[in-house]
UniProtKB/Swiss-Prot annotation:
The lineage of its organism: Viruses, Varidnaviria, Bamfordvirae, Nucleocytoviricota, Megaviricetes. It is found in: Host nucleus. Its main location: host cell. Its EC number is 3.1.-.-. InterPro entries: 5-3_exonuclease_C_sf, HhH2, PIN-like_dom_sf, XPG-I_dom, XPG/Rad2, XPG_DNA_repair_N. Keywords: Endonuclease, Host nucleus, Hydrolase, Magnesium, Metal-binding, Nuclease. This is Putative RAD2-like endonuclease 095R. It comes from Frog virus 3 (isolate Goorha). Probable endonuclease. PANTHER family: FLAP ENDONUCLEASE FAMILY MEMBER (PTHR11081), XP-G FAMILY NUCLEASE (PTHR11081:SF69). Belongs to the XPG/RAD2 endonuclease family. One of its GO terms (cellular component) is host cell nucleus.
Length: 363
């Protein structure tokens, strides 16, 4: 998702993601890639995605963080190949999960040697989670069962999911809009226009766009009360590039909208850009750059012209929390769970929307 191999390259130059408390953005506005957030929560295996939404929105209100949620609009045709590849990978994972789940049931019933696909999953869990290699411990078997169940689970985002997400935002008074194209690029441009203070998206396309437009920090994740951030200014400084050169490096790495040059990785791409200044200046004796579609890919990664929509985005203001909508959108068990998990959220939500929680169980 995003620029291929960019973050490992940056890490090799000492540029790492770092964390900041969410409270640091109190009173400020974040332009959030709502599509990224929804996909992230749908792929969470341990907690229902709609509860994660409730928790996050409550936390944002508690910390007095203003948010503009922006969802993907019409993707450019150049992204069709990447979208098709993602669908195929998702379908293949679900099919493998279904197969391994059936093999697990046979193994739990009959014992003996595991089928090859199940054995590969078991071996991976033994290495990554420190499970008992004998796989005889009940807790170990349960971990394996849960993992296999998640492999076969359909985590594709539906139109109903988007509708529920938007209703959830309405309940908490957060404004939202559809981007003219890619949400992550729109988030950066909204910041560049001075309408928001920082963008948030996991998609590294935003780093290319931010580096070009002078947006110094891109938040790449939100986990509880902590934001993860990446500095575009430090990234450019560490690599010795300006914004236009950083953009060309990203184009050469390969993106969701183009293919990189065969057998030309990020390290070589950086050397070529530093030596010649731009893709167009790379000598013809070097590998052909035609597959990069550099002009069009730069145009996409730069983000669309947002000035025509300035008034629409400036009119996106935060509204009060609606207790009535919260009760209609979130099931009672989610509201009860929220109140009893975090005393700060409990006190804050009872102040902002006491009627929404009046029927929750008391402890």
């Amino acid at each position: 998702m995003g620029i291929k191999g960019l973050k490992p390259l940056l890490r090799s130059y000492g540029v790492h993601e770092y964390t900041v408390p969410l409270s640091q953005m109190s009173g400020k506005t974040i332009a959030v890639d709502g599509t990224f957030l929804l996909h992230k929560y749908k792929n969470c295996h341990s907690v229902p995605w709609h509860y994660l939404t409730l928790y996050t929105l409550s936390n944002l209100r508690l910390r007095n963080v203003k948010v503009l949620f922006i969802f993907d609009g019409m993707s450019p045709p150049e992204k069709s190949r990447e979208k098709s590849n993602r669908r195929c990978r998702k379908q293949a994972l679900m099919e493998k999960g279904t197969l391994v789940k059936a093999q697990l049931e046979v193994w739990k019933k009959d014992g003996g040697e595991q089928a090859p696909e199940l054995a590969a999953v078991s071996e991976r869990l033994v290495k990554t989670r420190g499970l008992d290699p004998s796989l005889t411990d009940p807790e170990t078997v349960q971990v394996l069962t849960d993992y296999v169940d998640n492999m076969s689970r359909d985590t594709r985002v539906t139109s109903d999911d988007y509708e529920l997400m938007r209703r959830s935002l309405d309940a908490f008074g957060f404004p939202y809009a559809d981007a003219p194209d890619e949400a992550e690029l729109c988030c950066v441009r909204v910041v560049q226009m001075g309408i928001a203070d920082a963008p948030m998206t996991i998609d590294s396309d935003a780093l290319a766009c931010g580096a070009l437009h002078g947006v110094d920090v891109v938040y790449t994740d939100l986990h509880g009360e902590t934001l993860t951030a990446m500095s575009t200014s430090k990234s450019k400084e560490a690599l010795g590039l300006n914004g236009e050169q950083f953009m060309d490096l990203c184009v050469m790495c390969g993106t969701d909208f183009n293919q990189r040059v065969h057998k030309l990785g990020p390290v070589t791409a950086l050397k070529l850009i530093k030596a010649h200044g731009s893709i167009e200046n790379i000598p013809s004796a070097a590998p052909s750059m035609s597959c990069l579609e550099a002009v069009r890919t730069r145009e996409i990664l730069s983000g669309g012209d947002m000035e025509s929509r300035r008034k629409d985005y400036e009119a996106m203001v935060q509204k009060p929390v609606s207790a009535e909508l919260i009760r209609s959108v979130f099931p009672p068990e989610f509201l009860d769970k929220l109140l009893h998990e975090n005393w700060q959220l409990r006190d804050a939500m009872k102040r902002m929307a006491p009627e929404a929680f009046e029927k929750c169980k008391r402890k």
